[in-house]
């Protein structure tokens, strides 16, 4: 499990348009975004699946609507002061990210399953990668 306090790529304000949420979720390459209000209070999470379901269920999807209108409030979260063991127990293949809040309910970090990929420059190398790293002695 990794606890990351650099959460800006995963955060969107509830008043921002859905279009911005889609752009952020695309940029962070993790398949989700955490919705907070102007005080940083956790309101919900939006995943790729939430967006797809919203598009399918909407007769006329409006990307300029505020994110708060489609946020999934049925989320799993934990307190940042909880034990690592109790936080890790909430993570599995279905739940790979958990927002962590302070005592006031503000999102201050995320917990996620350890990424099996190695990031080198802008390249992700993982178990399914067809890359090989070699050592050179120039």
Residue spans for each PLM region:
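Bateman (tandem CBS) regulatory domains
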Residues: 1-10, 64-75, 131-133
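Short beta->alpha transition motifs characteristic of CBS
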Residues: 27, 34, 41-56, 94, ...
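The conserved cystathionine-beta-synthase
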Residues: 10-30, 36-37, 55, 76-95, ...
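N-terminal nucleotide-binding beta1-loop-alpha1 segment
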Residues: 115, 127-138
């Amino acid at each position: 499990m990794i606890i990351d306090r650099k959460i800006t790529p995963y955060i969107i304000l509830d008043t921002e348009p859905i279009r911005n949420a889609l752009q952020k979720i695309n940029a962070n390459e993790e398949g989700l975004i955490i919705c907070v209000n102007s005080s940083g209070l956790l309101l919900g999470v939006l995943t790729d699946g939430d967006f797809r379901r919203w598009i399918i269920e909407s007769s006329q999807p409006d990307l300029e609507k505020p994110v708060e209108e489609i946020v999934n409030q049925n989320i799993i979260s934990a307190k940042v002061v909880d034990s690592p063991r109790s936080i890790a127990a909430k993570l599995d293949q279905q739940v790979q990210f958990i927002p962590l809040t302070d005592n006031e309910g503000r999102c201050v970090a995320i917990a996620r399953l350890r990424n099996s990929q190695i990031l080198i420059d802008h390249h992700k190398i993982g178990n399914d990668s067809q890359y090989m790293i070699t050592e050179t002695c120039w």
